[in-house]
Amino acid sequence: MQPIDELIERLKKGDRRAVAKLITLVENDESKAKVIIKKIYPLTGNAHIVGITGPPGAGKSTLLDKLIKEARREGLIVGVIAVDPTSPFTGGALLGDRIRMQRHSTDPGVFIRSMATRGSLGGLSKATNDAIKILDAYGCDVIFVETVGVGQIEVDIVKTADTVVLVTIPGLGDDVQTIKAGLMEIADIFVVNKADREGADITYFELTLALDLEKEKWEKIGWKPPIIETVGTTGKGVKELWEKIKEHKKFLEESGKLAEKRRTRIEEEVKTIIAGIVAKKVEASLSEFEDIISMVLNKDLDPYSAADLVLEKIVGR
């Protein structure tokens, strides 16, 4: 493996292999990830990050395949990070039907990487956020982050993306109820994919009703999430979806909300890093504090006071 500085120089020159190697490093070596991000950070902050989320089987990869085409038609450099729940057997990402996107892999203007959540409680891993920064520094104009909308991931995608696209399909049972469990709150654009299926009009109607109930909220924000009907396999509605993504980007920039979002993102990231550092220090030092643990065991000290004492000693170092 080449030295990090050499890889970064190659990244600046548009070397795709260097990008792949840097992402592998941030995935597998936290100490190297720290060095890489420090060095490339001034080059970041230019890409528009679009989260594509929704339940399994919603056809996200098919849609994304078509969205890549739309972006490339405009000459944009595209990055794609496809996040999968970690395979319990290999620790790698489960590729599934994402193979169809690989036809773009010979296009020098498209970089696609599949990543696992890797034990971050089902959420987006720190490595995913670092990979986004690497693609940003590489010069991607738009970075799509595709996730399965389950567990913690759908919450994390809001902290990561500038624009969140929620993809649903007819036939999920109580469609809006299924989505409502946290997902309604996070979407900037709704997509009813596989709109040629029976029940698509009902899904569209239910989403419209649910959004209309939040009328005051949208008026305050200045953006009401549009609902786009698509058929990913034929490309129907994809151009309209791409236009709405661009429209939302323009809204964020002109309203000042993009700067707000990014500030919140940085705050969250710094807090996460601090929490990780403290957790590691506590884990490494806990054996030194056997006396404190014994005091809690003997009811001479409560767990909160014990935690305060341990943190005091660790932070004071």
Curated annotation (Swiss-Prot):
Binding, GTP: G54, P55, P56, G57, A58, G59, K60, S61, T62, D196, V231, G232, T233
UniProt name for this protein: Putative GTPase PH0274
Organism: Pyrococcus horikoshii (strain ATCC 700860 / DSM 12428 / JCM 9974 / NBRC 100139 / OT-3)
SUPFAM superfamilies noted in UniProt: P-loop containing nucleoside triphosphate hydrolases
GO molecular function per UniProt: ATP binding; ATP hydrolysis activity; GTP binding; GTPase activity
Keyword ATP-binding among UniProt keywords: yes
Domain of life: Archaea
Keywords: ATP-binding, Chaperone, GTP-binding, Hydrolase, Nucleotide-binding
Enzyme Commission numbers on file: 3.6.-.-
Function field: May have GTPase activity. May also bind and hydrolyze ATP. May function as chaperone.
Similarity section: Belongs to the SIMIBI class G3E GTPase family. ArgK/MeaB subfamily.
Any matching Pfam family: MeaB
Broad enzyme group: hydrolase
Database matches in CDD domains: MMAA-like (cd03114)
InterPro entries: AAA+_ATPase (IPR003593), GTPase/Isobutyryl-CoA_mutase (IPR052040), GTPase_ArgK (IPR005129), P-loop_NTPase (IPR027417)
